[in-house]
Amino acid sequence: LTFWRWVTAVIVLIPFVWKDVRDNLDLVRRHWKIYLAQGTFMVGGGTLLFTSLNFTTAINASLVNTTQPAVTALLTWIILKDRLKNIQYVGIASAIVGVVFMIAKADLAVLINLELNIGDFIVIFAILSYSMYAINLRKLPPGLGTFPTLFVILFFGTFPLLPFYIGETILVGPVPFL
């Protein structure tokens, strides 16, 4: 289903972006690797988040997902060596403390007896994927508008999903649309 979700998004965008993308095909060809990486991070994050819901609760996934801005800021600091402002450190700390407080329901015993499952870890990988997408946005070349760039990223993002879609279709059967 994820594969078709992204293919549908690509198809819907075509009439609005085709001329701009066609006029900038040389730019897209020269920078295909960053578009593929961005597509993989964007589509991967969404796919992992939805996959996690097969194993964990929506509440757990939502709580862990609230750390997204903090993780993005931390990765920007670690990978890109960007300096963070004091207010960002405060924001990161408060996000982490807030999530821990909510998960624990203000009860230390809950944290001590916390049982994580595979779905919780998949959410973490989804967050990491989204964060990598966010911090690599600055690597995108100038020249395409917002929607043409989104189109190209989504277009390239469907390719990493294709083997999984084919495998699922062979092993489980085609995805019902209705």
PLM feature spans:
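Specific transmembrane alpha-helical segments of multi-pass solute transporters/efflux pumps
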Residues: 18-65, 101, 178
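Loop-to-transmembrane alpha-helix entry segments
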Residues: 29, 65, 81-101, 116-117, ...
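Juxtamembrane helix-start motifs in multi-pass secondary transporters
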Residues: 1, 87, 146-150
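Hydrophobic transmembrane alpha-helices of multi-pass small-molecule transport proteins
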Residues: 13, 36, 75, 84-106, ...
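Specific alpha-helical transmembrane segments that line the substrate/conduction pathway
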Residues: 1-11, 42, 50-83
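Transmembrane alpha-helical segments that form core, pore/gating elements
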Residues: 13, 72-74, 78, 111-169
